[in-house]
Regions:
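Short glycine/proline- and aromatic-enriched beta-strand/turn motifs that initiate or cap beta-hairpins
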Residues: 24-62, 208-221, 232
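Residues that define the transmembrane beta-barrel architecture of outer-membrane proteins
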Residues: 27, 51-55, 101-105, 126-128, ...
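Repeated loop/turn-to-beta-strand initiation elements of outer-membrane beta-barrel proteins
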Residues: 29, 68-71, 117, 165-169, ...
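Residue-level detector of the transmembrane beta-barrel scaffold of outer-membrane proteins
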Residues: 30-32, 70-72, 131-133, 168-170, ...
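Residues on the lipid-exposed face of transmembrane beta-strands in outer-membrane beta-barrel proteins
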Residues: 33-37, 59-63, 107-111, 134-138, ...
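Extracellular/periplasm-exposed beta-strand and loop segments of Gram-negative cell-envelope proteins
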Residues: 44-48, 80-89, 93-101, 140-148, ...
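Gram-negative (and chloroplast) outer-membrane scaffold detector with strong preference
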Residues: 67-144
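Predominantly the C-terminal beta-signal and adjacent terminal strand-loop region
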Residues: 84, 164-232
Length: 232
């Protein structure tokens, strides 16, 4: 009787220890999806952010270096559009509009304002944090009068929230500065005023406003539950 009771108590203690160790486990990687809207700023939309908001979606992979820093890769699809009316005046009263899809492959570095985790409260870690991002990407927009291919520089900010262990929600706004002209896919908009300029002075930008859901995987430390193995 006593032997059976001691055995059950021992198994219960082992089970509780394992559950605690698993609940404190941190993960190195995230994978998931993003969806929201995209809009264009350029010769066919100079002054109205969020005008012509179109659908956007993509996949995201994140490597969490520590609680403060992460590296992110994304593959995005978005629809952009613009129209040369109203404040967008052109020589000789010229008017045009466009709508086209684009694909983007990019990578960014992210900095979390707070150490990001739903565990290890003694380190000051929080399950919610704002963050900043900067990176480099490549944009491809087929079709139109001419296909468009250009590097881009993404800049942005967002927030992350650890909804539950291994499940993250996010909201992100970012702008992309393209290093080539002709994102609209219309010859008329490549140089509407007949004035040549460098790639750094072109007016073709696009932006994403996205919601994301990601799932953690890749255990950071499989065999221990020791604070010295947790980077923050």
């Amino acid at each position: 009787m006593k032997h059976g009771l001691l055995q059950r108590m021992f198994m219960l203690c082992v089970g509780m220890f394992l559950m605690q160790a698993l609940s404190a486990q941190e993960y190195k990687f995230e994978v998931g999806g993003m969806a929201g809207g995209a809009f264009y700023m350029g010769d066919a939309n100079k002054n109205s952010p969020f005008k012509g908001l179109n659908p956007a979606a993509g996949a995201v992979f994140r490597y969490n270096i520590n609680f403060r820093w992460a590296l992110k890769a994304n593959l995005m699809w978005g629809q952009i559009s613009g129209k040369t009316d109203g404040a967008n005046a052109f020589p000789n009263g010229g008017q045009t509009d466009f709508s086209r899809s684009l694909l983007e492959l990019g990578g960014q570095a992210e900095f979390n304002f707070f150490p990001y985790s739903d565990k290890f409260d003694y380190t000051g870690a929080k399950r919610f944090t704002p963050y900043l991002l900067v990176g480099l990407g490549m944009t491809v927009a087929p079709g139109g009068d001419a296909s468009f291919v250009s590097p881009n520089i993404p800049l942005g900010m967002g927030v992350k929230y650890k909804l539950r262990p291994r499940l993250n929600l996010g909201c992100e706004f970012s702008v992309r500065k393209t290093l080539g002209d002709g994102l609209e896919g219309k010859d008329m908009l490549n140089d509407p005023y007949g004035i040549s300029s460098s790639a750094l002075k072109n007016k073709d930008w696009y932006s994403f406003l996205l919601l994301s859901v990601t799932y953690d995987f890749g255990e950071r430390c499989r065999t221990c539950n020791n604070a010295k193995h947790i980077e923050y």
